[in-house]
Amino acid sequence: SKKTLEKTHIEKKSLNTKEKIDIAKKACSLIKDGDTIFIGPGTTLEQLALELKGRKGYKIRVITNSLPVFLILNDSETIDLLLLGGEYREITGAFVGSMASTNLKAMRFAKAFVSANAVTHNSIATYSDKEGVIQQLSLNNAVEKFLLVDSTKFDRYDFFNFYDLDQLDTIITDNQISPQHLEEFSQYTTILKAD
């Protein structure tokens, strides 16, 4: 099999698990009854799906291009679920490409939750340009735009810049973020630290 620079889903799942749970809990607390939301691919966002699934008394609609997110939520009785189809990227479990893009363009969300591999200066980056394009579209079509990243992602680089930080409403990260990073990235957008 060909070697890749991109970490696999399994590799990512075991990294910074506590931080991801904290971030997911914080994000979950911002989702209101009746919201229509987009959840992108990534292990932090899968954790958000788990938090949503365990929540009682809320009826929401979730659109996702992540097969793992879909599989977490597909037997929930309180979540209307829509999976965007398209070209499948096995390494992250995401559907991408023109079919996913075309469907996404017609949709609007109260909130979009995406993740990234790297946050540097005023930009957010990921390894795959195809995944980046889908994340970009979902953010463009959302009233409120959220980036969920653990504190190890700041001042990191990756291949494809898909959004500017100052176009986001909020970054949700863990409480291990350094004071320097908090100060630096707060000039672009609001940073919420998980409890």
Place the predicted regions along the sequence by residue.
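A general structural motif
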Residues: 34, 57-59, 142, 168
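Short, well-ordered beta-to-alpha junction loops that form the rim of enzyme active sites
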Residues: 41-43, 117
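A short acidic, amphipathic alpha-helical/loop segment
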Residues: 47-51, 184
